[in-house]
């Protein structure tokens, strides 16, 4: 049972320098960077550390996920951010749960025993609201429908046919899993503060994308 970990980056030299030396290559069959056009030395640092890099032509997290999965083969795929928000030690925990028979496992930043050191009150409220909407309208059972740190069976990922280009791919994945009544196993964890770099999340822009997506998925996607 093989797993590829996709490390999604765009100008994350500070985080990559601190986080990636903590990631053990024996945790997964492959660990591959998908880079959206970094100009701060992220790509060079990744190669220096011995990682393969796929160059992303179009920007956006959703696009990066599909670029990576389309270019590779494995039984499971995992998406990881090296900006400091994702704990490296959670990588083997996610993989272990797939060995126990779970098709989808993700990290929750807002479960009962979770801690987010990075989210401000606007982000907390937004996460609660959109997670509530996903659970209410699509039958989900999530405590965090907006986190992208997850492992998913490749066959299932392909069946979801995601088309969201940006951060909204995280919510779209949860919605489409819920509509198919496929359970996600959540691991409660800690979200540390970001390490350097620029925050990619713009609350108003992302909020508008997520709202439109809920309407679109509710009306059109079966």
Show which residues each predicted segment covers.
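Short active-site alpha-helical segment characteristic of glycosyltransferases
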Residues: 87, 169-176
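Short, well-formed alpha-helical segments that are part of the catalytic scaffolds
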Residues: 9-25
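Conserved donor nucleotide-binding strand/loop of the catalytic core
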Residues: 29-32, 43-71
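A conserved acidic beta->alpha catalytic loop
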Residues: 35-43, 84
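Catalytic donor-sugar/metal-binding loop of nucleotide-sugar-dependent glycosyltransferases
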Residues: 140-141, 165, 175-192
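Cell-envelope/extracellular polymer assembly enzymes that use nucleotide-activated donors
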Residues: 2-4, 172
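Acceptor/aglycone-binding surface of glycosyltransferases and processive sugar-polymer synthases
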Residues: 57-59, 63-71, 76-79, 89-167, ...
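Short beta-strand/loop segment that forms part of the nucleotide-sugar
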Residues: 20, 28-37
């Amino acid at each position: 049972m093989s797993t590829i970990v996709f490390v999604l980056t765009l100008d994350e030299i500070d985080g990559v320098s601190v986080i990636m030396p903590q990631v053990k290559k024996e945790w997964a069959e492959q660990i591959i960077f998908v880079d959206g056009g970094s100009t701060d030395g992220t790509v060079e640092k990744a190669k220096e550390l011995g990682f393969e890099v796929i160059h992303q032509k179009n920007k956006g997290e959703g696009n990066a996920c599909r670029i990576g999965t389309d270019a590779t083969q494995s039984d499971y795929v995992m998406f990881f951010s090296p900006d400091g928000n994702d704990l490296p030690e959670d990588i083997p925990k996610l993989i272990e749960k797939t060995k126990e028979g779970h098709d989808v496992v993700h990290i929750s930043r807002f479960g009962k025993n979770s801690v987010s050191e990075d989210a401000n009150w606007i982000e907390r409220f937004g996460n609660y609201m959109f997670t509530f909407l996903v659970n209410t309208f699509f039958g989900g059972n999530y405590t965090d429908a907006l986190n992208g740190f997850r492992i998913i069976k490749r066959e299932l990922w392909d069946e979801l046919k995601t088309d969201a280009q940006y951060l909204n791919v995280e919510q779209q994945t949860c919605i489409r899993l819920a509509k198919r009544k496929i359970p996600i196993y959540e691991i409660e964890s800690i979200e540390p503060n970001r390490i350097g770099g620029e925050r990619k999340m713009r609350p108003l822009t992302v909020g508008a994308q997520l709202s439109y997506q809920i309407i679109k998925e509710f009306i059109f996607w079966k």
